[in-house]
């Protein structure tokens, strides 16, 4: 027998290498086999619920890194709440309607040389449904591969008949509250997709446009002109007024081009820009100009000056050309003065017959140059240049949009939703009540809701939920009775293809039998052809899924909505407005937002830049747990960087965490927690110190999970594993675990704490590195078969007050300071070739009183803490290397060669080795006797 055969060396089959790309699918199969999601529901039945409502991703294309970030964050939170003992179900969902799917289907039809016009609406909708379902199934598998646990068997889809039916009922509630109305007002309009757009569908990009100063001749004076500035010359045919601020000062500036009226504060800027010189001959207040008349420069039309609080003095002239059909603020002022929302432009952005002949059929952006030429021709152009400015674009086709007044359905922000409040007021009140993480999200959504226009909910497309209202053919009355909405909702719910029936059935088949107009008694009706905005689709998910849905595990309202910060103007807002309109309450209590993903250099990702990181690639190379770990490396409330150099570093951190678990398992192969667990009071002091440290970790982790600060958990555990454990405690422990007899108190005390560390750290990390935690857990079950069959069925560790010993922690902080100085002295001795290993060292210490007393009390075993062979205290230390301590002031550390010979079993140098022919040190001799091993049996 060799000496190494007498040591308790680690034994485990837990692999050093994770091989996650191959291992993780096995764990997924295990979760499916045991039906983990259902088991969790059974296990947590009757417990307090925690509902995180999933904001539905769009069913188009493969998932990208932003999807992965979002779903992993949700999964971490849900798993944590579940491991806190709550019933935390997760029902994933998909947004299935909308223009991008229509465009993809149209593209596929084009490839097959089929015209969309040759298909009925139902046939086209069927193709859209199939396309959406294909990507729901693709994305479902991709999300599952990330380790997301949820009700994948029964997700919610906005195109399901039951969902569409509930959406129709929600629409009915909104109508019956008097919040919805039909009106003609300017909305964002995409001239390429030929549909209205929501504010949330708008993206801003830089665009080059003409910037022109134009003079409008005053009616009451031969040579006096109002001067306006615009970057949209194409809107001039729709000009029906000029707006001035009532309180601003305006001057009459006499020049060679006539007397020009501009804001006093902008005169110098105007002179500099145009190069015009002259003199101010008169000054008036804006309110003095109200109702003054002027001639349109190229259309035979007289219009007036109106007062507007929206006029600003940032740029231009302080006089704003007013086209109520092409601007939100223009429209508001137009309504105030009874001016029509005139927009002589069709769905494709082409001028129609109400425009001058020379513009008919021309697209708006192409008309700019023609209009500028005309202004020059009639001597109305004062100055022109080209500027680059931020301009709204369609998020789908990336083309610039216009404001265009068209008949649409709106949800009014000023309609009363209860006795005391308008929708805007009630929504703002709820914003105050809801908790926003990070806190500045509250101000963001608050300012958006304060300033937003009425919500345009109608779209002129095919693939969506219809606006289920009827019009009386006899008197024009809009039919919006709740009984009609309920009747249509019932038809949709019970039809295999849901809302398709609206486009297939005759009007009389959609109305209740014998239905008559409440106003005139007429029985002839026509149905609305527009569909609902997709933001209304997803905005009613709180009702269609949580409140009235078919998932008994859910409840309304949600505890948490968690999405990207762009959803303050998207899903958070549409859900808030719909819920407040219908139920006078926000559908959520807390809203948490994350930032966007950037490349390693902090740049936006794009295919053209070649810096896109696909989740699939990371998973294939490194595994999903590395991606999950990436999510918690930084504060995700800010933008978060990703790239393969970063992923490599995270994989290295993962390796250290994994090897720590391997250390635990390897040294617990003979530990039976039911028999070998050492009571706290019998533990060795250093083990009690580590238990106290562990309680701090549990406390920080719990607080950080509660606050959603997952990066704090990652950095806390990373430092604990690399510094406190690997570099200190586990390093010190090796001697005791390997050398002492298997059943000795010294070894069992260490194993007891390793067991506590293993259970606690694995549970804390389970929501984050879910696959690895499960893999570790299955090895833990070999040690204790009584524990739950999955780590995710377990409960988070709680702080054990009995284990907290702050005095002991302070004592060990001081011992660690001494240890730091000793290691520096040994490193110096190593450089001088005096020692190769710390065990070869004898250390003599001179310490200040407080430190000396601490070491003196522990002198019989402190050498193991310092990982040297001998430790002595002296007021005058001498040795081969002598240094002054840095961590402990007024300390001196001397290092010499250790006395005695090296024990071949424990490698510590001791004077008992070789004495009277004894081959090992006294300590090893005692341990071997306990183990019934005779010295003569050893080689």
UniProtKB/Swiss-Prot annotation:
PROSITE patterns, per the entry: AA_TRNA_LIGASE_I
Pull one GO CC term from this UniProt entry: cytosol
Keyword Ligase, does the record have it?
A: yes
Subcellular localization(s) per the UniProt record: Cytoplasm
User: HAMAP family in the record, alphabetically?
Assistant: Ile_tRNA_synth_type1
Q: What is its biological role?
A: Catalyzes the attachment of isoleucine to tRNA(Ile). As IleRS can inadvertently accommodate and process structurally similar amino acids such as valine, to avoid such errors it has two additional distinct tRNA(Ile)-dependent editing activities. One activity is designated as 'pretransfer' editing and involves the hydrolysis of activated Val-AMP. The other activity is designated 'posttransfer' editing and involves deacylation of mischarged Val-tRNA(Ile).
Q: What is this protein called?
A: Isoleucine--tRNA ligase
| Protein species of origin | Sulfurihydrogenibium sp. (strain YO3AOP1)
Supply the source organism's classification: Bacteria, Pseudomonadati, Aquificota, Aquificia, Aquificales
The encoding gene is: ileS
């Amino acid at each position: 027998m060799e000496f190494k055969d007498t040591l308790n060396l680690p034994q485990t089959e837990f692999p050093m290498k994770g091989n996650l790309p191959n291992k993780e699918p096995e764990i997924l199969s295990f979760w499916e086999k045991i039906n983990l999601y259902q088991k969790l529901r059974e296990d947590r039945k009757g417990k307090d619920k925690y509902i995180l409502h999933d904001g539905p991703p769009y069913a188009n294309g493969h998932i990208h890194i932003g999807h992965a970030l979002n779903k992993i964050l949700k999964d971490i939170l849900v798993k944590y709440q579940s491991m806190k003992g709550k019933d935390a179900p997760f029902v994933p969902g998909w947004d299935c309607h909308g223009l991008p799917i229509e465009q993809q289907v149209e593209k596929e039809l084009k490839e097959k040389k089929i015209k969309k016009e040759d298909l009925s609406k139902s046939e086209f909708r069927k193709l859209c449904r199939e396309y959406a379902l294909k990507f729901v199934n693709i994305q479902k598998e991709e999300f599952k591969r990330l380790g997301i646990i949820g009700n994948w068997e029964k997700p919610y889809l906005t195109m399901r008949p039951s969902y569409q039916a509930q959406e129709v009922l929600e629409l009915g509630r909104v109508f019956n509250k008097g919040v919805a109305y039909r009106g003609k007002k300017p909305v964002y309009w995409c001239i390429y997709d030929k549909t209205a757009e929501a504010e949330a569908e708008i993206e801003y990009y830089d665009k080059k446009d003409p910037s022109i100063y134009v003079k409008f001749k005053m009616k009451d004076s031969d040579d006096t002109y109002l001067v306006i500035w615009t970057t949209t010359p194409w809107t001039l045919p729709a000009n029906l007024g000029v707006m001035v601020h009532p309180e601003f000062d305006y001057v009459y500036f006499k020049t060679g081009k006539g007397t020009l009226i501009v804001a006093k504060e902008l005169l110098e800027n105007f002179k500099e820009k145009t190069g015009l010189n002259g003199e101010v001959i008169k000054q008036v207040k804006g309110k003095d100009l109200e109702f003054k008349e002027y001639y349109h420069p190229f259309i035979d039309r007289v219009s007036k000056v109106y007062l507007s609080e929206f006029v600003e003095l940032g740029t231009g002239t302080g006089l704003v050309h007013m086209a109520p059909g092409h601007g939100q603020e223009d429209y508001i002022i137009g309504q105030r003065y009874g001016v029509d929302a005139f927009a002589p432009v069709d769905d494709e952005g082409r001028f129609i017959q109400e425009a001058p002949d020379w513009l008919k059929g021309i697209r708006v952006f192409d008309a700019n140059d023609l209009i500028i030429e005309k202004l020059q021709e009639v001597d109305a152009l004062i100055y022109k240049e080209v500027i680059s400015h931020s301009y709204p674009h369609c998020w789908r086709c990336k083309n610039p949009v216009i404001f265009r007044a068209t008949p649409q359905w709106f949800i009014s922000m000023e309609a009363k939703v209860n006795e005391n409040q308008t929708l805007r007021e009630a929504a703002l009140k709820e914003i105050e009540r809801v908790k926003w993480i990070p806190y500045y999200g509250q101000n963001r959504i608050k300012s958006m809701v304060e300033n937003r226009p009425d919500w345009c909910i109608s779209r002129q497309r095919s693939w969506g939920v219809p606006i289920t209202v009827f019009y009386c053919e006899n008197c024009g009355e809009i039919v919006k009775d709740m009984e009609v909405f309920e009747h249509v909702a019932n038809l949709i719910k019970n039809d295999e293809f849901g809302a398709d029936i609206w486009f297939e059935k005759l009007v009389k088949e959609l109305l209740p039998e014998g239905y008559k107009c409440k106003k005139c008694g007429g029985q002839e009706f026509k149905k609305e052809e527009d569909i609902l905005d997709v933001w209304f689709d997803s905005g009613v998910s709180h009702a269609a899924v949580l409140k009235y849905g078919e998932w008994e595990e859910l409840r309304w309202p949600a505890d948490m909505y968690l999405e990207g910060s762009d959803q303050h103007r998207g899903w958070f807002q549409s859900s808030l407005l719909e819920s407040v309109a219908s139920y006078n309450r926000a559908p959520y209590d807390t809203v948490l937002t994350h930032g966007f993903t950037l490349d390693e250099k902090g740049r936006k990702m794009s295919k053209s830049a070649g810096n896109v990181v696909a989740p699939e690639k990371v998973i294939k190379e490194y595994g999903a747990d590395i991606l999950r770990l990436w999510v918690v490396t930084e504060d995700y409330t800010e933008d978060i960087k990703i790239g393969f150099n970063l992923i490599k570093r995270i994989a290295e951190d993962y390796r250290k965490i994994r090897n720590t678990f391997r250390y635990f398992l390897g040294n617990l192969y003979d530990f039976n927690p039911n028999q070998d667990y050492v009571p706290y009071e019998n533990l060795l002091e250093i083990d009690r110190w580590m238990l106290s440290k562990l309680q701090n970790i549990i406390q920080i982790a719990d607080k950080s999970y509660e606050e959603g600060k997952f990066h704090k958990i990652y950095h806390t555990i990373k430092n604990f594993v690399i510094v406190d454990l690997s570099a200190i405690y586990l390093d010190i422990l090796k001697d005791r675990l390997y050398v002492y007899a298997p059943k000795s108190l010294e070894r069992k005390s260490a194993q007891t704490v390793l067991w506590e560390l293993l259970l606690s750290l694995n549970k804390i990390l389970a929501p984050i590195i879910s696959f690895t935690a499960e893999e570790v857990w299955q090895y833990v079950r070999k040690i204790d078969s009584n524990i739950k069959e999955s780590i995710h069925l377990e409960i988070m560790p709680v702080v054990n007050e009995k284990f907290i010993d702050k005095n002991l922690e302070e004592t060990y902080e001081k011992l660690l300071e001494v240890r730091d100085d000793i290691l520096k002295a040994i490193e110096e001795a190593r450089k001088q070739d005096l020692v190769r290993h710390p065990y070869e060292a004898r250390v003599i210490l001179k310490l200040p009183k407080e430190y000396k007393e601490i070491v003196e009390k522990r002198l019989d075993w402190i050498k193991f803490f310092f990982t040297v062979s001998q430790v002595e205290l002296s007021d005058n230390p001498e040795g081969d290397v002598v240094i002054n301590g840095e961590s402990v002031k007024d300390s001196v550390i001397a290092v010499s060669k250790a006395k005695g010979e090296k024990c071949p079993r424990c490698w510590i140098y001791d004077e008992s080795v070789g004495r009277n022919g004894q081959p090992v040190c006294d300590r090893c001799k005692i341990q071997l006797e306990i183990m019934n091993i005779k010295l003569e049996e050893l080689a």
